[in-house]
Amino acid sequence: MSLTLAIYGKGGIGKSTTSSNLSAALALKGAKVLQIGCDPKHDSTFALTGMLQPTVIDVLTEVDFHHEEVSVEDVVHTGFAGVDTLESGGPPAGSGCGGYVVGETVKLLHEFGLYDKYDVIVFDVLGDVVCGGFSAPLNYADYGVIIACNDFDSIFAANRLCLAIKQKSARYRVELAGIIANRVDYELGGGTTLLEQFAETVGTQIIGRVPYHDLIRRSRLMGKTLFEMEGPGKEECTTPFLEMAEYLLNRPRSTVPKPMGDREIFNVIGGWR
C-alpha cells in the first residue's frame, strides 16, 4: 500500500519547490514516487520535469470526460530520478470546485490501476485553502505535512491547517507527520524559534529545516531540482531533503494536532521570542 502525503502551507511559502525536492529525495532513496499537483496554476511539477504539463482536467475536457479515451501517457509524465508527475489542474477562476478535480484525478488513477503501483504518492496542494474542496487530498492521505517559515502569517496559516487535519482525522486515517521549516535564516529570520514553540503547543514536531539559500531560488527559475544544481551550498540544501525522505519512508510518529483558536494564537504568538 502506498505511503500518501498531503503537503500544505501558506500561499507562496515554497510548497511546490519543497514537494518536488522531497519527491526527488524519496526517489533517490529507492522509492517509486508519484507527485500530484493540485493547483489550477499546474506548476507543481515544473522543477521535476522542466515544463508545464497538460492537466487531468484539460485532457478530460478534450474527450468530454470519457475516461476510457484517456491513456496513462496523456496525464502522467516522468521527471528527474524517475518521479512520475501529474497535474490535476482545476476549474476556471471563480467557478467549480477543486475537490471535484482531485476526486476525478484519484478516480482516473484507480481506473489505470496506478494508485497502488507507487511506494509514495505526494499531493502538493494549493495555498492555505482549507475549504472542503482543496482539503480533499487529506481524505486519501496517511499523513499531512505543513510547510511554514518563522513568521506570524505562516504560523497562523499552519494553525488553520492543523484544524483541518484534526477535523479530517475524525473520519479518515490522516494524521499530522510534522512541519517542514522553510527559508530558515538564523541571522535575520530568527531561525526556527517561533516554529518550535508553535509545534510544541499544537503537539507536533519539526521534521526538517530547509535553509534560505539562493541556490533554491535559482533551481526554481531553471526548472530543476536541487540535486541537479551545481554551486556553493548544494550539500547544505539537499541534505535536509534526504533526511526527511528517510524519516518519512520509515512511517514517522504522527499525531492529531491540537490547534489554537484564532483569537488565542493572536494573543499567544506575541509573547514568543
Swiss-Prot record:
Mg(2+) binds at residue 16. Binds 1 [4Fe-4S] cluster per dimer. Pathway: Porphyrin-containing compound metabolism; bacteriochlorophyll biosynthesis (light-independent). The keyword Iron-sulfur applies. One of its GO terms (molecular function) is metal ion binding. ATP binds at residues 12-17, 41, 182-183. One of its GO terms (biological process) is photosynthesis, dark reaction. PANTHER family: LIGHT-INDEPENDENT PROTOCHLOROPHYLLIDE REDUCTASE IRON-SULFUR ATP-BINDING PROTEIN. Belongs to the NifH/BchL/ChlL family. This is Light-independent protochlorophyllide reductase iron-sulfur ATP-binding protein.
